[in-house]
């Protein structure tokens, strides 16, 4: 299959591993890595089947698989494109606490660091103006806390936007840009502000916002 120039550029900038000269090298690298964890008696067949699937785009692997599978030095990256986070997973009885919120923010940072996309329903965060027992003040609300997620995403991916003259061997020219999905349920008191948030230029620009 003859690739268009724009397709070659996308491959070079996003998916080509060091020392790979052509797209078929990328396909072989993925097939070998996928087969490497199989039972020895099945490795060759799995390799051949996977290679056939990839060759000439009979099928195509996800972006993180294509970019990272079988590449030395990228063991800390993910092979999944997107993650949906559940606040209940952190184990706090009162997840809507400063401890719970910042633990969820840490989980977001680790997900983006590994190049995964991030999604979460933020409805569990109490709305702005609610009294915080034991502190004597009121909560800043969902949108204020979402700004922390925004800053975290921008900070983690900022290095990938810096133009440098020297690319270390094995270093990517591009990484994922901190993609996030933020959801708020229709019943939440801040839903109108949530809907209008992106009318302000530069606000929550790392988010795709959806009403649940």
Question: Where are the regions a protein language model picked out?
Answer:
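Extended catalytic cores of very large enzyme megasubunits
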Residues: 1-212
């Amino acid at each position: 299959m003859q690739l268009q120039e724009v397709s070659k550029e996308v491959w070079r900038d996003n998916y080509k591993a060091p020392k790979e000269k052509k797209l078929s090298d990328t396909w072989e690298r993925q097939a070998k890595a996928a087969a490497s964890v199989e039972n020895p008696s099945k490795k060759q067949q799995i390799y051949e089947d996977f290679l056939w699937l990839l060759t000439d785009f009979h099928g195509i692997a996800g972006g993180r698989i294509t970019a990272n599978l079988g590449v030395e030095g990228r063991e800390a990256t993910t092979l999944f494109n997107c993650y949906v986070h559940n606040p209940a997973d952190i184990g706090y009885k009162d997840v809507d606490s400063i401890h719970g919120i910042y633990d969820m923010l840490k989980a977001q940072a680790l997900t983006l660091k590994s190049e995964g996309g991030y999604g979460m329903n933020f409805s569990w965060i109490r709305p702005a103006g609610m009294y915080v027992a034991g502190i004597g003040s009121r909560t800043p609300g969902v949108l204020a806390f979402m700004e922390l997620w925004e800053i975290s995403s921008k900070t983690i991916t900022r290095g990938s936007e810096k133009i440098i003259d020297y690319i270390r061997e094995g270093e990517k020219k591009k990484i994922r840009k901190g993609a996030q999905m933020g959801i708020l349920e229709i019943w939440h008191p801040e839903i109108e502000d949530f809907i209008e948030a992106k009318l302000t230029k530069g606000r929550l620009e790392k988010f795709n916002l959806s009403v649940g």
